[in-house]
Amino acid sequence: MTEMNMYWRTDRPKEGFYTTQLASHPQRPVRTFLPNDYQPRYPYPLVVLFHGHGGSEDQVLRLAPKLSRRNYICISLRGPREVGIRPDGRVGFAWDDVNHEDETEEYLMRAVEETRRTYHVHSERVFLAGVGEGAGVAYRIAFRMADRIAGMIALNGAVPLPNGRPLFNLRTMRGLKVFMGHGIANTDATFARARRDYRLLYAAGADVQLVPYRTTHELHPEMTRDMNQWIMRAIHANTDLLLGKR
């Protein structure tokens, strides 16, 4: 993400969940998980979470403390379309598949900017992570912003292929870090599809890892553990590169 003048808060708010209202998107709040023992002098990696079909920003942010209670600031975004009531009685949302990349990217950028105004976020350690349909959104944005993010995670999702063609530009894909966690019994997006996506991204030059899990479209408990380890490796690899280590 680009640098900007930041004046984040210097106190130490408690670990927990917070809500931010964006003036630019009043109907689409941003939920934040702040880690334990937040240190305002430390630039935290930021993980942006996109929920699955019928989910919500509250529901997907529950992954944050399972990912790590110390390592990251996490935010979650709300899809633009209501799709009924969830089993917990709350409204579920979805992401429109086509022709909304500009709007979603604008929403993301405003959410990241507001988070960076409030908390100390490392500008070069922003990761996108999506679940199910949200993984498709993360892919779309990552392909457009490959040079502005540190990497992306897709859990039980698929690379969007409108008209049978990928959305990415080969010139921007080289070196993009991608973690794919996928259930081998997933019938919504099959594991065979995940393998094809892996080969597609690998051939385009992405630094991609595909990890299978014994689950369906439901998230496996080990996914967040592996996500945490993958993000930390990605951060350390970039640090070593900057320091000239091999």
Regions found by a protein language model. Give the residues of each.
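Loop/turn elements at helix/coil->beta-strand transitions in domains of secreted/extracellular proteins
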Residues: 44-45, 70-72, 123-125, 147-151, ...
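Short, well-ordered alpha-helices that flank and scaffold nucleotide-derived cofactor binding pockets
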Residues: 65, 143-147, 196-199, 203
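Serine-hydrolase catalytic machinery in alpha/beta-hydrolase-like enzymes
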Residues: 5-121
